Design a protein with these regions (language model features):
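Active-site loop segments of alpha/beta catalytic cores
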Residues: 7-174
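Alpha-helix N-cap recognition
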Residues: 1-4
Length: 174
């Protein structure tokens, strides 16, 4: 965990390019055959709050925005590398899981989401689509307020477990 930003050293981030991390990807297309091969990326929001803690993550939006952006950028770069590996492995799609919703609203204001997270998602989705991968996001809770943004930046498929709390009629407009 990164309890204090003074303890944060980007050089200590895991080296995602180490070959041992990719041993399970070799032969994935052959094992999948003609089945859809969905590759998993590194969640952006979930990983940040796992590293910083939930309270620190929300506070960082206001008190340490540049440090927060630096951490998000590292995770984006890791995903960009992963996308290249998954493209080479002939994956069909790319997913990560970030639960943005509560039962009846986002956990973050749409404005702060657009300021901090939308640009990061946009970079990942652009790279995935350029690599020929469909983009997927799993997110629980009420996320209607950012669905247009996600679609705008290249999300192809949203997977959710709580669609009833947003109203199926409401979701059908997307």
């Amino acid at each position: 965990p990164i309890r204090e930003w003074a303890d944060f050293d980007p050089a200590e981030a895991p080296d995602i390019t180490e070959e041992r991390r990719w041993s399970g990807v070799a032969g994935a297309r052959e094992r999948a055959g003609d089945q859809y091969l969905l590759a998993s990326g590194i969640s952006l929001y979930e990983r940040v709050h796992f590293l910083r803690g939930l309270e620190n993550t929300w506070t960082d939006l206001y008190t340490n925005p540049e440090d927060l952006r630096s951490l998000i950028d590292i995770l984006v770069e890791m995903n960009l590398y992963a996308i290249k590996r998954y493209q080479a492995a002939e994956a069909d799609g790319f997913i990560f899981c970030d639960d943005w919703g509560l039962q009846d609203r986002l956990m973050i204001s749409p404005e702060k989401w657009r300021e901090f997270w939308k640009p990061a998602y946009a970079r990942v989705y652009a790279a995935a689509r350029a690599a020929g991968l469909q983009t997927f996001l799993h997110s629980c809770g009420y996320i209607t307020d950012i669905l247009p943004d996600l679609i705008e930046i290249g999300l192809d498929v949203i997977q959710m477990d709580q669609q009833e709390n947003m109203g199926l009629d409401n979701l059908s407009r997307f």
